[in-house]
Amino acid sequence: MKRKNIALIPAAGIGARFGADKPKQYVEIGSKTVLEHTIGIFERHEAVDLTVVVVSPEDTFADKVQTAFPQVRVWKNGGQTRAETVRNGVAKLLETGLAAETDNILVHDAARCCLPSEALTRLIEQAGNAAEGGILAIPIADTLKCADGGNISATVERTSLWQAQTPQLFRAGLLHRALAAENLDGITDEASAVEKLGVRPLLIQGDVRNLKLTQPQDAYIVRLLLDAV
């Protein structure tokens, strides 16, 4: 039986650092919201079988997304944190039978709307059949400094350091177990949850274009990248 690839996009955050009058995933760039651009990446990819977006129960913007993508599942069962939102989404996928424990879940940041299709293909091809799963990541290029107040306290050896990106691909059953803990403090991505089970996910070469919209100035770069597609 073919293993399904299911994109899960947690979109329950408010994007406080972005400083807009709405969550950053609903900021419009061109004629579409950031979230619509992100969903389109997965909907256009032939290896992705289903896309699920998990939003806050209080979300008032999601209806537009559902109208634009009627085939996408938009669920209002997001949690207080990213980890809780992903946990709720994976649990519902398993409960409804839309995913089996052996299917792949590709968790992707709603605010990474410039993911190149070739990077997504690379992740699926290299990690899709790996029991330990894998994530997109790029080697750290800049020199890193530790700070003590406003002063440098140390320079960090960067040889073995990678910057994690998304999607992060794991079997549904593994991800469900990894996020089952009552206390998810310190879990900043799916890989960190899986690592707590002793699993060592694969590092798959990511792409510098796969940036996360975080600060207002990021919108300028994102707009240029989207215009170049």
Swiss-Prot record:
CDD domains: CDP-ME_synthetase. Its EC number is 2.7.7.60. Pfam families: IspD (PF01128). GO terms for molecular function: 2-C-methyl-D-erythritol 4-phosphate cytidylyltransferase activity. Pathway: Isoprenoid biosynthesis; isopentenyl diphosphate biosynthesis via DXP pathway; isopentenyl diphosphate from 1-deoxy-D-xylulose 5-phosphate: step 2/6. Keywords: Isoprene biosynthesis, Nucleotidyltransferase, Transferase. The record marks R158, K212 as: Positions MEP for the nucleophilic attack. InterPro entries: IspD, IspD/TarI, IspD/TarI_cytidylyltransf_bact, ISPD_synthase_CS, Nucleotide-diphossugar_trans. The keyword Oxidoreductase does not apply. SUPFAM superfamilies: Nucleotide-diphospho-sugar transferases (SSF53448). The keyword NAD does not apply. Gene3D superfamilies: Spore Coat Polysaccharide Biosynthesis Protein SpsA, Chain A (3.90.550.10). One of its GO terms (biological process) is isopentenyl diphosphate biosynthetic process, methylerythritol 4-phosphate pathway. It comes from the Bacteria. It catalyses: 2-C-methyl-D-erythritol 4-phosphate + CTP + H(+) = 4-CDP-2-C-methyl-D-erythritol + diphosphate. The record marks R17, K24 as: Transition state stabilizer. Catalyzes the formation of 4-diphosphocytidyl-2-C-methyl-D-erythritol from CTP and 2-C-methyl-D-erythritol 4-phosphate (MEP). Belongs to the IspD/TarI cytidylyltransferase family. IspD subfamily. This is 2-C-methyl-D-erythritol 4-phosphate cytidylyltransferase. It comes from Neisseria meningitidis serogroup B (strain ATCC BAA-335 / MC58). The lineage of its organism: Bacteria, Pseudomonadati, Pseudomonadota, Betaproteobacteria, Neisseriales.
